[in-house]
């Protein structure tokens, strides 16, 4: 690491989650306490949502609680999520050496990130990561459950499923590595319409479809890459929780869908 490391500071602390370390610790602990962990020692990957914690925190916690039985075996997290703040063709790894949160610093696995950067469709872009919330909101959960770990964060723009799968596969099989894909589901439909759309999307994920689009999930490109790799590996997709903002903290006129899944 550089003598003066490049640190990505939090972009959405105080917006999507508490900026105060003590308040954030208490909120994450409460979310984790509220869900029942499902022991899955063969877990290879998770799909988790990325809205503000009052909206999707409980759905995310349902996945992160499953890490408890295997936490000691995980030393590195590959984290893929969609680009919301910049237009991006392909994928981007950060220029930063550290991602900071109110709970502390998460070191970037620069060697692992450099290997992904050698692939076609991958660039190094600090700007793609600077304001991106889809990856950042996962970090306090990971810090709470895992303690110390290194991170390979990848922002995904418009990209073929095979290219995304290749980026995942570059490091996924190495010991101590967990893969997480961050995505929300449908956006801004009525409560009942969102339930219909998200249920159909869930069925496609359970069938490992690589044909998802942005109307179904903002992380469709990352999900299609994950499903591409999951098919090749004969992994199964299991639903942990499915809801929308009308079930948690929002009105039911215009809702956003959330789901958590594990792959084993």
Per-region residue spans from a language model:
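Short hydrophobic/aromatic beta-strand or adjacent loop that forms the aromatic wall/cage
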Residues: 255-260
